[in-house]
């Protein structure tokens, strides 16, 4: 009989009480969506000495691959081996397991960037992971992946994915958002002594502007920003390459479902066109405005998208605050 190793993982701490329940709501789903899921048993949320932990058992000893994947979870913090007792000492007893997620740029890059309507950076990391886990590239290193946010706003998705190690590209129609994001990248890299090369260009035929950043010296990542219409994403991102993942948080300023449906109706076919086969899109939205069934029907109209609605992807709805009482997440694969 194969022995098991019991693990207790702290929930990721949140900077704001506004998001205090975020990890509690989503940590189990993130773990069960990951490549680790087939090796896990008895996954449950519990409390040890008044602190919340996600507890589970792993078949056999904990491996380096286990630790690498656990360290990359957005909703988990410190990782511990859990003992009911050791010798005559009764538990629960915790043994810390060294686990760190390497960052290409400091993880505070996403946290430092402040702007109106910003999406929580821990949740953004979660979205990136859920897209990756649903794709054919779930076990790939982030350094091998390209991530696009076609509604990037102030850039939280870009900076989260860049920190993980991906090449990134973002589009937004708001001039202030894009220009201030380009300025922030330049200032942040200068202040943190991160090598940076940049170029700005005009795409006159498309009525758009692009900023191209090369971040790093020997180990380089690309960051492309585009001021333009997300519905023309394949044209605007020419030269970036087809992304493995598309990750975005749909705008909450849309007060009625019809404009949101119109936006997605215009954009989804182009997004599917540029996504690599086996890639995935993950997006969140205010589901009090447009319910999950209606959103699934909308995405389902794009023949090349296969909606991932198996557990745990079908239970990602959660409360955000008094304004957004219910936010949901939908993930779809590119056939």
Language-model region placement:
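Class I S-adenosyl-L-methionine-dependent methyltransferase catalytic core
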Residues: 2-32, 70-76, 86-148, 152-335
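Short secondary-structure junctions
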Residues: 35-40
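Terminal-region recognition feature
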Residues: 52, 64-74
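A generic structural motif
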Residues: 50-61, 330-332
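Short beta-strand
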Residues: 43-49
